[in-house]
A protein has these predicted regions:
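Secondary-structure junction motif
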Residues: 95, 176-199, 285
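Beta-alpha-beta core module
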Residues: 140-145, 152, 217-261
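Hydrophobic hinge/microswitch elements
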Residues: 186-241
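A late-sequence structural motif
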Residues: 243-288
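Short beta-strand-centered segments that line the small-molecule binding cleft or hinge
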Residues: 114-154
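N-terminal hydrophobic or amphipathic helices and topogenic motifs
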Residues: 1-111, 275-291
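Flexible hinge/capping segments at coil-to-helix
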Residues: 147-154, 158-180
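Short helices/loops that flank or line small-molecule/ion binding pockets
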Residues: 26-27, 113-128, 211-223
Length: 291
């Protein structure tokens, strides 16, 4: 181990959380300590930090860094430092409102699939929970272990003051009269294709970290349509369900690297999340646990 656990944690948590201040809060130290440890890690690893579009990234030869991260991840799995988990905005409050012992959790703000799965691939994150089925890797993917937790029908949501709120027997032409939110092309290809076939997913929203103003907050204009299920509806009381069947089942899942799936700490996490899934499903008629 070339770099100490605290030194590399200061660097990688800054990359994960987006700032040294956020990393300091997660580590329970002051920002100057994080900055000092980060500088030390960068010097030992021979890389530098650059900021781009609100994200902190590394520049230089990262071969030694990747080797160190693998060693450090094994140390975390053996209990020498806290393991790291994050979730998307819809899954985090339900599954990680109480963080399991031995883990620290992010802010449930990482966007899309590419960024969080990149952090998993690079061993900055150890586990991720998200509500992005059917767009997650297949069960036989050689790189990823995906444990399905819950499933529920996806719904069209809008402001309670929307002209279609409370109306029955809506048609596709009714929906097409109004703007409908879309994420960047290719973020969720299966979901995108399905919704586009129904005249939805037309007005692109781009963000680098989840902000409610950039998603459910868009419905405050009284006309914009968005999407969710019973879990997201409970988190977004500013929305109402429209009478339209999207004929799409979405789902929450745990995602980890395939080579970590059999680690005891990961299996303990899986058991914790499966128990949470069963408890969550009991609260909603249309939410089903997978196991």
């Amino acid at each position: 181990m070339v770099v100490g656990l605290d030194q590399l944690a200061a660097l990688d948590l800054s990359l994960w959380m987006g700032s040294g201040a956020a990393a300091a809060g997660l580590l329970g130290v002051n920002q100057s300590t994080v900055s000092r440890q980060q500088r030390s890690a960068l010097g030992l690893l021979g890389v530098s930090v650059v900021s781009s579009r609100g994200e902190v990234r590394l520049r230089g030869d990262v071969e030694l860094l990747w080797a160190e991260r693998e060693v450090h991840q094994m140390a975390r799995l053996r209990g020498f430092a806290p393991l790291r988990i994050d979730a998307n905005y819809a899954s985090g409050p339900w599954f990680l409102g109480t963080v399991p012992e031995g883990w620290i959790a992010g802010r449930f703000a990482l966007p899309g699939l590419q960024r969080p799965m990149g952090l998993l691939r690079e061993r900055v994150l150890d586990a991720w929970v998200c509500s992005y089925q059917p767009d997650l890797p297949n069960a036989d993917d050689p790189d990823w272990w995906v444990l399905d937790l819950l499933q529920a029908p996806l719904q069209v949501l809008a402001s309670p003051q929307h002209p279609l709120a409370g109306e029955r027997r809506l048609s596709q032409s009714d929906l097409e009269r109004f703007p409908s939110l879309a994420l960047p092309d290719g973020w969720f290809p299966s979901t995108e294709a399905h919704l586009r076939q129904q005249g939805l997913w037309r007005n692109a929203v781009e963000f680098h970290r989840y902000d409610p103003d950039d998603w459910e907050g868009r419905s405050h204009d009284g006309v914009t349509l968005l999407y969710g299920n019973s879990l997201t509806e409970a988190l977004m009381p500013c929305t109402a369900r429209l009478d339209w069947d999207l004929q799409l089942i979405c789902g929450d899942a745990l995602v980890v690297r395939r080579d970590l799936a059999d680690q005891p700490a990961i299996q303990q996490l899986a058991a914790f999340l499966l128990a949470r899934a069963r408890a969550i499903a009991e609260r909603f008629a249309d939410v089903q646990p997978i196991h």
